[in-house]
Amino acid sequence: MNLKQEKIAVLLGGTSAEREVSLNSGKAVLEALLKQGYNAHPIDPKEYNVANLKKDGFNRAFNILHGRGGEDGTMQGLLEQIGLPYTGCGVMASALTMDKMRTKMLWKAFGLPVADMKVVTRETFSELDPQAVVAKLGLPLMVKPSLEGSSVGLTKVKAVEELKSAVEYALKFDNTILIEEWLAGDELTVPVLDNQVLPAIRIVPEGEFYDYEAKYISDNTQYFCPAGLTPEREQALSTLVKRAYDAVGCRGWSRIDVMCDAKGNFRLVEVNTNPGMTSHSLFPKSAATVGISFEQLVVKILELSL
């Protein structure tokens, strides 16, 4: 299959809260494809009806949309309907992993380690008992929307009095909120490419946690790859991540975030099914340590499209 003879749509932008990040990722992917002689075109679903891709002569889509409408199964379903092969996870894995709560419940059912949590919805918010939550999960706590990506709507709660307002803030972004035990250990992210687990990256944010600012704007967030784990721990992490990837049905490529508790035990956090591909992005950083250039990575992801 010679993909250079195909007309490729690079899906970027979109309408989610992560539009800007997707535009940056898409630009980098598009440049890498054009540089290598691919017939690639930028397509922004905000301005173009993706249902017309096949009719307009496109053969394949490189989906680098982030967040709702691009990474949550809806775009995947549309592409399936028009019969256009696309990069990344399918409908089910994309929809499932967009929902952090249900992803964690599934992992838990598979016997995989996740943080202890309490789920609050818009409907149950009035019954929230901060004292009981703190008694069960301790302090500090992490409060986050279940569905929003890129660390939008997160709050670190250090006192019981702060819990309600943190949940109220998160409810601006989603109807389902997770209150989780605070994981005080290392923050790691682990890319998977074509069923191969790539080296983990350790993230050391300037602030208290890895939020939108640290992710996309700050140059003071530090990334370590290799992550400084012992070979045994790196292997254990790799095995855990592969099991987590398979449990939710990922394919092609994804990046899985993992936190350590104060004792160093791994806890699965979430799956990014369309990881960022900007200059700040972590997937390319990890791939580079095993000799895969950005251009090679983009082509590899494209070749894995189904």
UniProtKB/Swiss-Prot annotation:
GO annotation, biological process: cell wall organization; peptidoglycan biosynthetic process; regulation of cell shape
Protein's cellular compartments: Cytoplasm
Sample GO molecular function, one term: ATP binding
Cofactor note text: Binds 2 magnesium or manganese ions per subunit.
Keywords: ATP-binding, Cell shape, Cell wall biogenesis/degradation, Cytoplasm, Ligase, Magnesium, Manganese, Metal-binding, Nucleotide-binding, Peptidoglycan synthesis
Ranges for domain ATP-grasp: 104-303
Top-tier EC class: ligase
Annotated EC: 6.3.2.4
A matching Pfam family: Dala_Dala_lig_N
Official protein name in the record: D-alanine--D-alanine ligase
Organism for this UniProt entry: Haemophilus influenzae (strain ATCC 51907 / DSM 11121 / KW20 / Rd)
Lineage, top ranks: Bacteria, Pseudomonadati, Pseudomonadota, Gammaproteobacteria, Pasteurellales
Recorded name of the encoding gene: ddl
